[in-house]
Swiss-Prot record:
Keywords: Toxin-antitoxin system
Protein name, per record: Putative toxin MJ0605
The organism's place on the tree of life at top rank: Archaea
Keyword Repeat belongs to the record: no
PANTHER family for this protein: TOXIN MJ0605-RELATED, UPF0332 PROTEIN TM_1000
Species name: Methanocaldococcus jannaschii (strain ATCC 43067 / DSM 2661 / JAL-1 / JCM 10045 / NBRC 100440)
Protein role: Putative toxin component of a putative type VII toxin-antitoxin (TA) system. Its cognate antitoxin might be MJ0604.
Alphabetical list of Pfam families matching this protein: HEPN (PF05168)
Keyword Repeat: no
UniProt family annotation: Belongs to the UPF0332 family.
Length: 134
C-alpha cells in the first residue's frame, strides 16, 4: 500500500536516509581506524535515522531514542511488516551505543564489526520497505 505523504514529509524521509547512509560510511571509516567506540555510535545512528524515516510514513515522529525503538517495534515489527530480527538489531545497537558512550567499557573489534554489518542490513531493509511504501 502506497502512503499518501506530503512533499515535506517525503523530503524529510529522504534526508534521514541520507544521514543514515553517511553514518554508516563514517562507522566503516572509524572501524578501519580502530576507533570502535565511535564506530559503534555511528552504526547505531545509521539504524536510528533509518527507523525514524520509516516511522514518518505513518506520521510518527518520536523525539527520544526509546520512542523510536518502541514505535518501530509496535508499528512495523509487531504488525509483521518488518522481520523480528530488525527489532532485535535496533535494541542491541542502542544498548551497545549506550555502553560505548556512557561507560568506560570499550566495545571490542568483534562487537563493532558485528553492529556495522547489522546496521548495513538494517538500512538496506528500511530502504527496501520505503520503496514499497512510497
Amino acid at each position: 500500500m502506497k502512503a499518501l505523504l506530503n512533499k515535506d514529509i517525503r523530503e524529510e524521509i529522504q534526508a534521514l536516509i541520507e544521514i543514515a547512509e553517511e553514518n554508516l560510511s563514517a562507522a566503516k571509516i572509524l572501524f578501519e581506524n580502530k576507533l570502535y567506540r565511535d564506530a559503534v555510535a555511528r552504526a547505531y545512528y545509521a539504524i536510528f535515522h533509518s527507523a525514524k524515516a520509516l516511522l514518518l510514513t505513518k506520521n510518527l515522529n518520536p523525539k527520544k531514542h526509546a520512542g523510536v525503538i518502541k514505535m518501530f517495534g509496535l508499528y512495523f515489527v509487531n504488525e509483521g511488516y518488518i522481520e523480528e530480527i530488525y527489532g532485535r538489531i535496533i535494541t542491541k545497537s542502542y544498548n551497545l551505543r549506550w555502553k560505548a558512550d556512557y561507560t568506560t567499557d570499550k566495545p571490542t573489534e568483534e562487537e563493532a564489526e558485528s553492529i556495522i554489518y547489522e546496521a548495513e542490513m538494517f538500512v538496506d531493509r528500511i530502504k527496501k520497505a520505503l520503496k514499497e511504501i512510497l
